[in-house]
Each structure stands twice: as structure tokens, then as C-alpha cells.
Design a protein with these regions (language model features):
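Short alpha-helical elements
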Residues: 1-192
Length: 192
């Protein structure tokens, strides 16, 4: 009962937003970032997990989480979709949402999945595609993009988020923001 009320009032999202601004100011930065990194993660859902799709690229039946983090890995926006939503579709929508909350973002780093006019023309934000160097083989840490991958690793430590069990996308988003707020609280507590 309480969770549904907090979810519907976007309380977890507002708490995360306030904690991100507080931590940025504590670090001597402006409250609103000027650059960010965007990526997505596909996760499986349970049988009763509500709306889901199939991500053909990763061969996962479930949901896709699009995340926008600042250059230090602070979670700015997290948006779950069914897994069949392409990065280019979810990314453009996420950047449009970001304009309302973080109007000073000028540049976003992304992977090749976001290399589409739907993303680049969604807002006035410059989208820079970070890709592998030609001829490169094996795993190599890509500049800037590792920050958002680290964020996904952090939230996957939360047992409830390792697999998506929520019946609605709105509830899934609320749990993602609650986990993000918990990360920010730990970060602030360590610096105190």
C-alpha cells in the first residue's frame, strides 16, 4: 500500500534527483550536469513479471533498462521498457525526458546502438558515439562508457533487481530509483 503511493507520487525519483544534486555540489560541481553517458541493459523477467519483450541481439526475454548517468556514475534517469524496444527508440525518449530535469546537458556519450537520427535529432544534445578501434579484438574498456556499465553492475548487486519481477513498468522504475537513491546515500555517507 505504501509502496504504491510512493511510486505514484514519484517519490523515489525525486529522492534520487535531490541526492544526485547534493553529491555533485559536495564534490564541487554544478548541481546539474553538462555531460552524461547513456546505455541500456537487458534483464530477464519472471513468469509473472508483467509486460516483457524479446531482445534479439542479446537473446533475452524480459525488459530493457535505459540509464543516463553523469560522468562520475551518478544515476540521473533510469527508464525500463519491454526488451523489444531498440536503443535508438528508448534513447531518444530518455534524452527528451532529461531536458526537463537536467536542462544543461550538452553532450552525451553512447554506444553504436544509439547511432540513429531518432536519438541525435530528439534534442539539441550532442551525441558522441564511442566505438571500438578498427581491428581491435577481445574485451577492451571503452572511454567514458565504462561509467554506465559500472552503474549497472552496482544496481545488479541488489537481489531484487537481478531479475525483474515487477508487474508494471512503473513499479520496475520505482525500484530502480530506490536502488539508485540507496547508492547515492552510501556515497554521501562515505564522504561525511
Amino acid at each position: 500500500r505504501w509502496f504504491a503511493r510512493f511510486r505514484d507520487e514519484c517519490l523515489f525519483e525525486r529522492i534520487n534527483h535531490a541526492l544526485v544534486a547534493l553529491d555533485r555540489e559536495r564534490a564541487g560541481r554544478d548541481a546539474s550536469p553538462s555531460a552524461a553517458i547513456i546505455d541500456s541493459q537487458s534483464v530477464k523477467t519472471t513468469e509473472s513479471g508483467g509486460p516483457r519483450g524479446y531482445d534479439a541481439g542479446k537473446k533475452i526475454k524480459g525488459r530493457k533498462r535505459h540509464a543516463l548517468v553523469d560522468t562520475d556514475g551518478r544515476p540521473l534517469l533510469v527508464e525500463p521498457h519491454t526488451a523489444d524496444v531498440q536503443d535508438r527508440d528508448g534513447g531518444g525518449a530518455l534524452l527528451q525526458i532529461s531536458r526537463g530535469l537536467f536542462p544543461f546537458i550538452e553532450k552525451v556519450w553512447a554506444d553504436g546502438g544509439y547511432n540513429h537520427h531518432r536519438v541525435t535529432e530528439a534534442t539539441s544534445i550532442t551525441v558522441e558515439i564511442v566505438s571500438k578501434i578498427a581491428g581491435q579484438s577481445g574485451f577492451v574498456v571503452l572511454p567514458r562508457r565504462w561509467v554506465v556499465e559500472r552503474f549497472f553492475a552496482w544496481i545488479n548487486r541488489n537481489r531484487r533487481l537481478a531479475k525483474d519481477v515487477e508487474a508494471t513498468l512503473k513499479s520496475a522504475a520505482a525500484f530502480l530509483y530506490a536502488a539508485a537513491a540507496m547508492l547515492m546515500l552510501r556515497r554521501l555517507a562515505r564522504s561525511a
